[in-house]
Amino acid sequence: MNHVKHVIPMSDSSVSIKPEDIQPTVLPDAFIQSEIVRKLNTLCLPRYDQLPNVTLYRDQVIEYVALWMEPLSLCVEQPVITPSMINNYVKVGLVPAPVKKQYGREQIARLIAICIFKQVLPIAAVQALFNIQRLSYDAPTAFDYVVDQLEASIRAAFSVEQTPVPDTALQVTRESLLVRSAVSSFVSKAYLMSYLKFNGFNS
């Protein structure tokens, strides 16, 4: 005996909805093979020791961070970084204050991480996450872990196989699991926003 699924209308006065009305308008494979996903999969952020070994002025920092974040431009709020944002991050203690108006590796690493985490967390929560992470890891280890997990998670999410993402932490801790969860939340949002835009949605 064949059972036909029926879609229940929102109310008695709603127009009847047929099952075909809620079929996906785009097949997943078409999305995965799209230019949007191809661009996302080009994301390759620098590791800590690849960040500039000379200090940069604020405008140079903005240009540098925006360049590396560009593959994510379709699924992050724009602008991703501005002079006033940097000033605010310094003011609340998220980023160490510049020395003679110049920013070094640790500050640039912080700014890149903030650009990612602020997409899914309020700034106060990002600060709390940094404070927790600092209990177990130095700045280079913490930054490289974020980048490793982000790149691996994006490649896993935006592929047909969607294989599980290995945890690259040298030692899995509660702190590393929190960071991994934050990265996962960002990638989930990136997937949703990019898929909607592929379907014609413009925020």
Model-derived regions, located:
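Non-catalytic recognition/regulatory regions in large multidomain proteins
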Residues: N2-E35, R47, L74-C75, R174, ...
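Intrinsically disordered, low-complexity regions
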Residues: V4-V7, S14, P19, N53, ...
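Basic helix-turn-helix/winged-helix DNA-binding cores
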Residues: S16-Q133
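Intrinsically disordered, low-complexity, charge-dense segments enriched in Lys/Arg
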Residues: L129-S203
